[in-house]
């Protein structure tokens, strides 16, 4: 299987360069509306100083468990990853907990070759949202390949890129949705994950409402990801955001128009700013196969 390693070596020095990212920006979604000024507070600016009890009534379990970010073992700062591969394109998203000023802000993707880790790409941690994204073309989907994401020397996360199960008579898909935080298992789903492992699905499909923390979306997304990291790390995963993922009680999308936020946004569109919606979509869906038509809808919201 030399093809995959030819690709790896060709990409070994590839790094996406972007303009300087201000990881301490206190208003990354702007100040045009109250929704823009009051979202993702537990994961932006000087997040380590925020009193979780002040983040608002719409944040569900984030208020009750809001100090979670402050107590995370920093060796686990790189929390989880999810991927798909389709038509010879591998797409991987990694997710960090909010990072402190003196911690690394880029992540390296490595594949294991002949027992050794080989660097493929290095990409910046994006802000807001603290996600990282890798795209590998000419992917050989006929072999299993171990992968590792490394946040400098601080933290790492390992998994397996599974080969395409085209030799199987039956493809097993695990479908889950509506991951309520209102229970004792705050950051685990031990029984569910154990049962999933018994079925060993070829594909995971999370059909929406991965969290219910509304305006504290990064908090809820990390809660979800930590809960399911052990099953997502070694098989393709599809996540599709629904209403609660972007802070709504119902999803009124309406081509991406802006909502005034009254009566549950029943006037149509999105209550939260497009930059917030795009952050959620980036966190949850960047790893999906490329869309047939990538033209954004109104406000520049992605598809």
Name the predicted role of every residue range.
Residues 21-303:
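Metal-dependent phosphoester/phosphodiester hydrolase catalytic core
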Residues 17-19:
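Boundary at the C-terminal end of the N-terminal hydrophobic targeting segment
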Residues 1-5:
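Bacterial N-terminal signal peptides that target proteins for export
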Residues 6-12:
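Cleavable N-terminal signal peptides of Sec/SRP-targeted secreted and luminal proteins
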């Amino acid at each position: 299987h030399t093809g995959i390693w030819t690709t790896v070596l060709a990409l070994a020095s590839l790094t996406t360069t972007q303009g300087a990212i201000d990881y301490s920006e206190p208003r990354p979604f702007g100040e045009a509306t109250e929704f823009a000024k009051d979202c993702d507070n537990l994961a932006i600016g000087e997040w380590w100083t925020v009193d979780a009890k002040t983040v608002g009534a719409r944040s569900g379990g984030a208020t009750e468990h809001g100090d979670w970010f402050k107590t995370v073992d920093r060796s686990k700062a790189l929390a989880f990853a999810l991927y798909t591969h389709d038509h010879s394109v591998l797409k991987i998203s990694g997710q960090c907990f909010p990072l402190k000023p003196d911690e690394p802000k880029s992540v390296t993707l490595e594949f294991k070759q002949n027992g050794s880790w080989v660097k493929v790409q290095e990409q910046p941690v994006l802000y807001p949202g603290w996600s990282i994204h890798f795209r590998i073309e000419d992917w050989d989907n006929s072999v299993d390949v171990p992968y590792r994401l490394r946040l400098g020397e601080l933290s790492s996360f390992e998994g397996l890129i599974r080969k395409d199960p085209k030799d199987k008579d039956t493809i097993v898909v695990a479908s889950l949705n509506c991951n309520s935080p209102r229970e004792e298992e705050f950051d685990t789903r031990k029984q569910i994950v154990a049962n999933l492992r018994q079925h060993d699905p070829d594909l995971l499909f999370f059909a929406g409402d991965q969290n219910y923390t509304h305006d504290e979306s990064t908090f809820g997304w990390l809660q979800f990801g930590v809960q399911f990291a052990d099953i997502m790390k070694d098989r393709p995963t599809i996540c599709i955001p629904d209403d609660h993922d972007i802070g709504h009680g119902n999803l009124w999308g309406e081509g991406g128009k802006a909502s005034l936020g009254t009566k549950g946004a029943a006037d149509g569109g999105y209550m939260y700013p497009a930059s917030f919606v795009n952050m959620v979509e980036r966190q949850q869906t960047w790893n999906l196969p490329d869309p047939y038509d990538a033209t954004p809808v109104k406000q520049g919201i992605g598809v």
